């Protein structure tokens, strides 16, 4: 995540620094301040937070088993969790059915796309979901939501050409309930600028009165940064907002500012959008989020995602092989097959403890595309059993040339796969070295 990635780099630098401890603390505090301010976090919040970290790091003795640097990381973890909302677990499972969710937000926040993502998320949990296209303001909103509903496997209701958003919302909720929907998600219009915001808030009130939603969800673009504070308060005053979704966290340096600003209002962030694909939405849990920021990883989120797929046991077996250091091309083959189902490899790696701090030095080979994965699978299909079991045989040029001819690729592409194998093996070796540190953090309740 742009901006916030600098926090991970600050921690990585901290763990490598040498010299007097007070100097190390001061340098880390400066790096952390720069990272948070560049992420558009309120300057006053940043200086208060870093002041508390510095004072405790220099005055308090770390618990038995932790070095002073590790204690500094733990203090940073605790303060960032507070900054981004504290220790709470959002309840995403509806308390009863049918359950009506009304989506609100300004135009351009990614609201309609988020309706599709939510529909897909709840379909994945086994609920029957329906969506209502009540945005009559934006051209193309009806067609966009219809396509998203199809992709999500959700029921759809809309009235193309109608200019009566309140009536559409009321009739849509009634019909989808009759069709057996457990969850009904209503998309409403957004507006640009302060001049049109009053009209938006008035329409929002009228729709809420007509459909009596069980939950109102405010969608906020992460690029708003600190401005999210005022927006969240204005919407909440118009219609009580039950939860908030912060979108486009992958595309802006201001994500930290948006998250901290929303948390400062006391509102609960339930989900964050992490990409453009319909699957790229995740439950926002401050503790896990901060653990990933610091490079500690988020195994629980990763495991949740894996559980929604087939072949969980096979995946776990592959991960165990990789963690043990016994990596061959057979391991890489299985890993590439499975990761294509999970999403971009770098996003998966960021969830694994210890790996995210290494991504900066990871070879370009690890930046996988779907096209590259297919090509590499073809290359491995052209290898002998001996080569699959002993990748170092590819040091021989004659083997590289033979494999390239068999796969219909250039020798340089075979060497690229070999370099990828070496970078993964190196990464796993580094990860094993950090295992003790992670276990000690876990015992302290940090992750």
From Swiss-Prot:
It comes from the Archaea. It is found in: Cytoplasm. It catalyses: GTP + H2O = GDP + phosphate + H(+). Its main location: cytoplasm. GO terms for molecular function: 7S RNA binding; ATP hydrolysis activity; GTP binding; GTPase activity. Belongs to the GTP-binding SRP family. SRP54 subfamily. The keyword Ribonucleoprotein applies. Pfam families: SRP54, SRP54_N, SRP_SPB. InterPro entries: AAA+_ATPase, P-loop_NTPase, Signal_recog_part_SRP54_M_sf, Signal_recog_particl_SRP54_hlx, Signal_recog_particle_SRP54_M, SRP/SRP_N, SRP54, SRP54_GTPase_dom. GO terms for cellular component: signal recognition particle. Involved in targeting and insertion of nascent membrane proteins into the cytoplasmic membrane. Binds to the hydrophobic signal sequence of the ribosome-nascent chain (RNC) as it emerges from the ribosomes. The SRP-RNC complex is then targeted to the cytoplasmic membrane where it interacts with the SRP receptor FtsY. Its EC number is 3.6.5.4. The keyword Endoplasmic reticulum does not apply. GTP binds at residues 105-112, 187-191, 247-250. Keywords: Cytoplasm, GTP-binding, Hydrolase, Nucleotide-binding, Ribonucleoprotein, RNA-binding, Signal recognition particle. Composed of three domains: the N-terminal N domain, which is responsible for interactions with the ribosome, the central G domain, which binds GTP, and the C-terminal M domain, which binds the RNA and the signal sequence of the RNC. Gene3D superfamilies: P-loop containing nucleotide triphosphate hydrolases, Signal recognition particle SRP54, nucleotide-binding domain, Signal recognition particle, SRP54 subunit, M-domain. Part of the signal recognition particle protein translocation system, which is composed of SRP and FtsY. Archaeal SRP consists of a 7S RNA molecule of 300 nucleotides and two protein subunits: SRP54 and SRP19. This is Signal recognition particle 54 kDa protein. It comes from Hyperthermus butylicus (strain DSM 5456 / JCM 9403 / PLM1-5). GO terms for biological process: SRP-dependent cotranslational protein targeting to membrane.
């Amino acid at each position: 995540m742009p901006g916030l990635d600098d926090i991970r780099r600050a921690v990585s630098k901290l763990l490598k620094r040498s010299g007097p401890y007070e100097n190390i603390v001061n340098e880390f505090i400066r790096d952390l301040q720069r990272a948070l301010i560049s992420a558009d976090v309120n300057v006053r919040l940043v200086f208060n937070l870093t002041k508390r970290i510095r004072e405790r790091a220099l005055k308090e003795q770390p618990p038995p088993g932790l070095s002073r640097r590790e204690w500094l990381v733990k203090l940073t973890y605790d303060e960032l969790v507070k900054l981004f909302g504290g220790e709470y677990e959002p309840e995403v499972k509806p308390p009863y059915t049918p359950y009506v969710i009304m989506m609100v937000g300004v135009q351009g926040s990614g609201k309609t796309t988020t309706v599709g993502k939510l529909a897909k998320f709840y379909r994945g949990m086994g609920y029957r979901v329906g969506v209502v296209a009540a945005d009559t303001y934006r051209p193309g909103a009806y067609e966009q939501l219809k396509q998203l509903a199809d992709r999500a496997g959700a029921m759809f209701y809309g009235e193309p050409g109608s200019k009566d958003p309140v009536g559409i919302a009321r009739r849509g909720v009634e019909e989808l309930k009759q069709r057996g929907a457990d969850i009904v998600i209503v998309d409403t219009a957004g507006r640009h600028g302060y001049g049109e915001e009053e009209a938006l808030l008035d329409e929002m009130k009228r729709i809420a009165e007509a459909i009596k939603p069980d939950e109102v969800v405010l969608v906020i673009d992460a690029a708003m940064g600190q401005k999210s504070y005022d927006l969240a308060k204005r919407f909440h005053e118009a219609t009580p907002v039950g939860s908030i979704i912060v979108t486009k966290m992958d595309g802006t340096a201001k994500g930290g500012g948006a998250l901290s600003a929303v948390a400062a209002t006391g509102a609960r962030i339930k989900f964050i959008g992490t990409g453009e694909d319909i699957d790229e939405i995740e439950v926002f849990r401050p503790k896990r989020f901060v653990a990933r920021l610091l490079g500690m990883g988020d195994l629980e989120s990763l495991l949740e995602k894996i559980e929604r797929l087939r072949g969980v046991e096979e995946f776990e077996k592959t991960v165990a092989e990789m963690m043990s250091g016994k990596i061959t091309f057979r391991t890489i083959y299985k890993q590439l097959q499975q990761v294509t189902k999970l999403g971009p490899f770098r996003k998966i790696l960021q969830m694994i403890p210890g790996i995210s701090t290494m991504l900066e030095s990871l070879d370009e080979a690890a930046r996988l595309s779907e096209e590259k994965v297919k090509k590499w699978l073809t290359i491995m299909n052209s290898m002998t059993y001996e080569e699959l079991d002993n990748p170092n045989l590819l040091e021989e040029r004659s083997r590289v040339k033979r494999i390239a001819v068999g796969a219909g690729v250039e020798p340089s592409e075979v060497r690229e796969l070999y370099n990828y194998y070496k970078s993964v093996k190196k990464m796993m070796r580094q990860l094993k070295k950090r295992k003790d540190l992670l276990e000690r953090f876990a015992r302290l309740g940090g992750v």
